[in-house]
Amino acid sequence: MLVAYSDIVQREHKLFDGFFLHTGPVEGKGVDDVGVPVLHFITETEIDGILALETGGAVLDYTVPVSTQILPPLPPPYGADRGLIRVWEVAGASHFDKQLWAYTTAFAVREASSPADVPIYLEQPLFCGLPINEVGQGRVAAAALHHLNKWVASGRAPESQPRIELDENYRIIRDADGLAQGGIRTPPMAAPLGINRGDECTFWGSFQEFLITDILARYPSHQSYISAVTAAAMDSVGRGTLLYEEAMLYVEDAQARSAYWFGQ
């Protein structure tokens, strides 16, 4: 909806000073120059998942695997950074993840008059069989909004960020672990405990934990894991893709995950 608004209504009425678009394309296209700063905020779901496919084939049923219903993804419509357009692609992220699920579920339960009134989209599809994505794209979104506000106020565009790598069929290129290559990399991708993906389980993405032997080989102690996450978090702060306060939430998460090292 906001993509269509910014691309059509904004051109004529010029009501807004900038746009933050956290969505896939509309009719296979993104937003071009509309005279104000536009920041496209993209997860794997918009690149190689259900939101990349709205014109690649109709999604008939959101409760069964996407791959059984639709054609391969379309070419990404966002293009290179240019003029008043910036694109942030968050590797490993999904459109709707664990942190957002916790927030929206609490809100929906509070507002619902009965359990039956809680929206079904808050339930991960049963076919998935994996936990919800844990990347925490909302933490990166906070930095993106910060940069957009500065851009609107000062006229200085934020630096370009690396894009997620795609093959000739517009599929995400993955490393030996199954993690997306390129893109903005949060601590769960730079210091992983498992595979976060945004192209599975419709909007929710997925998280598949590494074997405990693999985790201990990567991080022999809890402190070594905390150190790896802290280094990744501070690197993201330096790159401008996390605010310091949001970066420290990843460190707190790492400090709380001590169970892997019990008895070590």
Region spans (language model):
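C-terminal His-loop and adjacent cap/lid subdomain of alpha/beta-hydrolase
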Residues: 1-264
